[in-house]
């Protein structure tokens, strides 16, 4: 019989990989990545980021003497094809809890001539908890600290290599791909920024954060390892940062239990909200031409870099939903495809939270003032000057809507719905 196949999906790494180590304990392995067209229907920047990290994973296999197959096509066709060609004894992978991942894995299992073994992914809390939580705090209280992460294999058995990895022009500079770069970034953050994370995490320029989200989104960096290393250092910064990592798992938990949140608000009252299909307003928001400095700077940075701080994301999202009344789903999708870290579950949770649509305890009547938010979280205006230099301050300049009138309009509509 042949080797065991280790099928990498949202886990483009060798460290802290239960499926890889389980397979290695049972025999020689060959890695596999399937370039799934269902996941590659996105922007060039996101395709390029994914492909460069697949390339880095292949190099990691090679450096340890192993081989990674890369096949292009539908997983329920290509995984069985690889298993047959290699005469594989079984396929190992980490469990996916997304709606598409569960559908995909069911079809692959049906088509495979050998067993498919799915092992738990190293979440901080498993998304498939039997009780469904809609509020973050009781969910987070279940967390008791990170379990020790698993080490990467020192060596991998030799095997045949198959498949080419295409090139894609991202249209913008990308971070250094691969888990070595991710681990180096984690070390740098823990040493230099974690001690002040609690005080600086809300900076609009994102310099108080880790900037590791593009690696987490593809599983290039294990969240369990990240939490473990942060908790070893301790302090308020570590506590706050691990809480943010738990928000990621809360996002997966929500999408697992409420898969329909991808299409409609968690709060059923807001399914009847009168969103405004205004193409001119949508384009003004999307292109960063609203006349509202914080929003314009945020959208321009996102277009230019594929990254945005959490504080800027919340403000850009809430302005679209609450001030402009734009359809939240269209905006969420457009926003996600600009992000290098465009994780569907995380972005859906973020937009429904910012929009007051039922995620967590975020009240619908909370409406950020983008002027005060800018002054508070970029007090010297350096971030604003970099991305929207035509604005001397955070005061609006010929805005597409009057901020106070738009706030009152939204609250009137939302309260009418909330009261039934």
Curated annotation (Swiss-Prot):
One GO molecular-function entry: DNA binding
PROSITE patterns cross-referenced by the UniProt entry: DNA_PHOTOLYASES_1_1 (PS00394), DNA_PHOTOLYASES_1_2 (PS00691), PHR_CRY_ALPHA_BETA (PS51645)
Chain intervals for the UniProt region annotation (Disordered): 147-176
Keywords assigned by UniProt, alphabetized: Chromophore, DNA damage, DNA repair, DNA-binding, FAD, Flavoprotein, Lyase, Nucleotide-binding, Plasmid
Stored PANTHER family: CRYPTOCHROME, CRYPTOCHROME CIRCADIAN CLOCK 5 ISOFORM X1
Function: Involved in repair of UV radiation-induced DNA damage. Catalyzes the light-dependent monomerization (300-600 nm) of cyclobutyl pyrimidine dimers (in cis-syn configuration), which are formed between adjacent bases on the same DNA strand upon exposure to ultraviolet radiation.
Protein name, entry field: Deoxyribodipyrimidine photo-lyase
Organism: Thermus thermophilus (strain ATCC 27634 / DSM 579 / HB8)
Gene symbol of the encoding locus: phr
């Amino acid at each position: 019989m042949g080797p065991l196949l280790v099928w990498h999906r949202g886990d483009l790494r060798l460290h802290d990989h239960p499926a890889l180590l389980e397979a290695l304990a049972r025999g020689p392995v060959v890695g596999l990545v399937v370039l799934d067209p269902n996941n590659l229907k996105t922007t060039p920047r996101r395709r390029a980021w994914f492909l460069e990290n697949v390339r880095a994973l292949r190099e990691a296999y090679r450096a340890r003497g192993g081989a990674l197959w890369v096949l292009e096509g539908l997983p329920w066709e290509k995984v069985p094809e690889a298993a047959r060609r290699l005469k594989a004894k079984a396929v190992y992978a980490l469990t996916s809890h997304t709606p598409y991942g569960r559908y995909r894995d069911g079809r692959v299992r049906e088509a495979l001539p050998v067993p498919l073994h799915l092992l738990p992914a190293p979440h901080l809390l498993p998304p498939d908890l039997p009780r469904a939580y809609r509020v973050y705090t009781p969910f987070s209280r279940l967390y008791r600290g990170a379990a020790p992460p698993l080490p990467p294999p020192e060596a991998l058995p030799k095997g045949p290599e198959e498949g080419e990895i295409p090139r894609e022009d991202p249209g913008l500079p990308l971070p250094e791909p691969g888990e070595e770069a991710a681990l180096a970034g984690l070390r740098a953050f823990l040493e230099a920024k974690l001690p002040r994370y609690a005080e600086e995490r809300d900076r609009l320029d994102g310099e108080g954060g880790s900037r590791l989200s593009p690696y987490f989104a593809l599983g290039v960096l294990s969240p369990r390892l990240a939490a473990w290393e942060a908790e070893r250092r301790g302090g308020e910064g570590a506590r706050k940062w691990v809480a943010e990592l738990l928000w990621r798992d809360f996002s997966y938990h929500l999408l697992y239990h409420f898969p329909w949140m991808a299409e409609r608000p968690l709060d059923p009252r807001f399914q009847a909200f009168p969103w405004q299909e205004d193409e001119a307003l949508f384009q003004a928001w999307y292109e960063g031409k609203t006349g509202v400095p914080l929003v314009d700077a945020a959208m321009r940075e996102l277009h230019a870099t594929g990254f945005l701080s959490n504080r800027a994301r919340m403000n850009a999202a809430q302005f679209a939903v609450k001030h402009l009344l734009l359809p939240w789903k269209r905006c969420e999708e457009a926003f996600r495809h600009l992000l290098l870290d465009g994780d569907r579950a995380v972005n859906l949770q973020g937009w429904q939270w910012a929009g007051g649509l039922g995620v967590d305890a975020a009240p619908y009547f909370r409406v950020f003032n983008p002027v005060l938010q800018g002054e508070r979280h970029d007090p010297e205006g350096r971030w604003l000057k970099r991305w929207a230099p035509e604005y001397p301050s955070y005061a609006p300049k010929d805005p597409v809507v009057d901020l106070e009138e738009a706030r009152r309009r939204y609250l009137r509509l939302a309260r009418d719905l909330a009261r039934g």
